[in-house]
A protein has these predicted regions:
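Non-transmembrane, aqueous-exposed alpha-helical and coiled segments at domain scale
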Residues: 1, 5-179
């Protein structure tokens, strides 16, 4: 279950700020950035413009995908006995793709992006910060599970689906893991 607290360590605050910036500061064509441009053009204050962008980001077709990643990992943790067993993890990822488990949508959330097919630069930055946070907070095993899924998912997807451009983890993959940590 997601935990929201009243106070955060300096490292937690820094990583959370980084996650928000990486989600918001991303070119001019995505939904939340476009929303910011439209709302700002009305002459409103900065806080209102950022609030509008965050409201847009919350939508499931934009940044809300990170919530799906979070719940997918909660499901994986419940069903995978050995978090270090690549074969068991890959088999479960296949079941997700085949709509046999989790939300039965056939998607491994946090994988793939329309533009970033080799790697998502935002994800690379966020992953490093989340790794430091996981180590500091004693969530090394959780982080290792994320890394295993990140490594195995493209192989499983490539085996089950036709992938023309490649598939890599995106910024949503690690963004809500920090809330759990």
């Amino acid at each position: 279950e997601m935990c929201i607290r009243d106070s955060y360590t300096p490292l937690e605050a820094k990583v959370l700020d980084m996650a928000l910036i990486l989600h918001m500061e991303h070119g001019g064509g995505n939904n939340s950035t476009f929303t910011t441009h439209v709302v700002t053009s009305s002459g409103t204050d900065t806080y209102s413009a950022i609030a509008a962008a965050l409201a847009s980001l919350k939508g499931p077709k934009h940044g809300g995908a990170n919530v799906k990643v979070f719940y997918m990992f909660e499901d994986i943790k419940k069903h995978i006995k050995d978090w270090k067993d690549d074969e068991e993890i890959a088999d479960y990822l296949e079941k997700i793709l085949e709509k046999q488990t989790f939300d039965r949508m056939g998607l491994i959330y946090g994988m793939g992006h329309a533009v970033y097919t080799i790697s998502d630069p935002r994800q690379i930055i966020l992953k490093g910060a989340v790794q430091k946070l996981a180590k500091a907070e004693g969530y090394d095993e959780d982080f290792e599970l994320y890394e295993r899924v990140e490594r195995l998912a493209p192989q499983v997807i490539g085996k089950k689906r036709k992938i023309y451009k490649g598939v890599a983890s995106n910024v949503d993959f690690y963004s809500l893991s920090l809330i759990h940590i």
